[in-house]
UniProtKB/Swiss-Prot annotation:
Class of the enzyme per the UniProt entry, highest EC level: isomerase
Name this polypeptide is given: Peptidyl-prolyl cis-trans isomerase FPR2
Membrane-spanning ranges: none
Control of this protein's activity: Inhibited by both FK506 and rapamycin. Binds FK506 with 15-fold lower affinity than FKB1.
Keyword Membrane: yes
Domain of life: Eukaryota
GO CC aspect terms: cytoplasm; endoplasmic reticulum; endoplasmic reticulum membrane; fungal-type vacuole; membrane; nucleus
Classification of source organism: Eukaryota, Fungi, Dikarya, Ascomycota, Saccharomycotina
Length: 135
């Protein structure tokens, strides 16, 4: 309960204060240490389900759930936005996180025309579905 209150307060204090300056990670579903056999590390191939929205308005701009297929990428090599490389690192399969990503770690001043406005801070609810270790 305290964690949910913390996320709520953090989320709304960020909106009231304006733009984010740092990546903020909230744990939605934690995996017990004894059940976490593999953590996602840079160089690993990962599969992630997600829903992305604009922090300011809450408008959802993309979701792998609606397509029925998670996104697959190599972690930590710049194939996704920096906020994802940083926010997914250390996750266990089945873990869920809420990533509040400042525009500087997302699409920056250019945004994504017609989808994400310039300098937009983003929120991603992510779930790590699979990890293939690089080692």
């Amino acid at each position: 309960m305290m964690f949910n209150i913390y996320l709520f307060v953090t989320f709304f204090s960020t909106i009231l204060a304006g733009s984010l300056s740092d990546l903020e990670i909230g744990i939605i579903k934690r995996i017990p240490v004894e059940d976490c056999l593999i953590k996602a590390m840079p160089g690993d191939k990962v599969k992630v389900h997600y829903t992305g929205s604009l922090l300011e308005s809450g408008t959802v701009f993309d979701s792998s759930y609606s397509r029925g297929s998670p996104i697959a990428f190599e972690l930590g090599v710049g194939r996704v936005i920096k906020g994802w490389d940083q926010g997914v690192a250390g996750m266990c399969v089945g873990e869920k996180r809420k990533l509040q990503i400042p525009s500087s770690l997302a699409y920056g001043e250019r945004g994504v025309p017609g989808v994400i406005p310039p300098s937009a801070d983003l929120v991603f609810d992510v779930e790590l579905v699979d990890v293939k270790s690089a080692a």
